[in-house]
A protein has these predicted regions:
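Hydrophobic secretory-pathway targeting helix
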Residues: 1-31
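Hydrophobic alpha-helical membrane-insertion segments
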Residues: 11-23, 47-52, 126-149
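Transmembrane alpha-helical segments in integral membrane proteins
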Residues: 11-18, 95-113, 182-205
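Long, glycine/tryptophan/cysteine-rich extracytoplasmic
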Residues: 19-86, 159
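Individual transmembrane alpha-helix segments
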Residues: 62-100, 177-188
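Juxtamembrane interface at the cytosolic side of transmembrane helices
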Residues: 102-146, 197-205
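Juxtamembrane non-transmembrane "cap" segments at the membrane-aqueous interface
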Residues: 141-166
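Solvent-exposed, non-transmembrane helices and loops of integral membrane proteins
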Residues: 162-177
Length: 205
């Protein structure tokens, strides 16, 4: 029972780690997004200005000590600020989960992986690898637009403040749907790399 709990807490750690890496890597690849997505033509601001405002937003979302969101070049509505506050809480929840489950992951590596007991969890790992693939295929079939909408409807039940009006919250113009598509693809690659590696390792004799 204790071993199973350690395993699933470790899987939760890897899941949260995949999310956090995606979030923090956004700081690195966003300058490329500005160029690839021609964001300067959407808001008529210099790339440096767009990036500066993005950094302010990301710092607010990821830093628990940052409590006020005020982007110098983008006004925000009450609904927009509410949505970002909700997202901030979700990000902090993921950070907390990663910290709480980190010790379990350490025990998992030392007590299960290194001692050769990973094969006992092969079926569980396979399920964790296949499930996101099936979800991804579903997303491809219905189109990312529909998938993105469904994702928000599930994550923010009864809250439609994620539906930004560019006239009231122009920051959405520098956060186009394609940017989130790239973030989803990055998360998928990280997630499948972690869990795929463990599954393949569990199958080795």
């Amino acid at each position: 029972m204790k071993t199973k709990l350690t395993f699933w807490c470790s899987m939760l750690f890897l899941f949260s780690l995949s999310i956090l890496l995606t979030i923090y890597l956004a700081w690195i690849f966003y300058p490329f997004e500005i160029q690839w997505l021609n964001l300067t033509n959407r808001v008529y601001l210099k790339p440096e200005t767009i990036q500066y405002n993005f950094h302010i937003l990301m710092n607010y979302l990821t830093n628990p000590f940052s409590q006020i969101l005020q982007m110098p070049d983008f006004r925000s509505s009450a609904a927009g600020l509410h949505h970002f506050a909700v997202v901030k809480n979700l990000f902090h929840l993921v950070q907390l989960v990663a910290l709480v489950t980190l010790p379990s992951f350490y025990v998992f590596v030392k007590g299960i992986v290194k001692k050769g007991f990973l094969s006992l969890f092969s079926k569980g790992l396979l399920a964790l690898v296949v499930l996101p693939v099936l979800i991804g295929l579903g997303g491809v079939l219905i189109g990312f637009d529909q998938f993105f909408t469904l994702f928000h409807q599930i994550l923010f039940v009864g809250d439609d403040t994620w539906l930004f009006d560019p006239a009231k919250d122009p920051v959405i113009l520098i956060l186009p749907e394609t940017f989130f598509l790239h973030a989803f693809l990055l998360f998928f690659a990280l997630y499948e790399s972690f869990f795929g590696y463990l599954y393949l390792k569990s199958r080795r004799k």
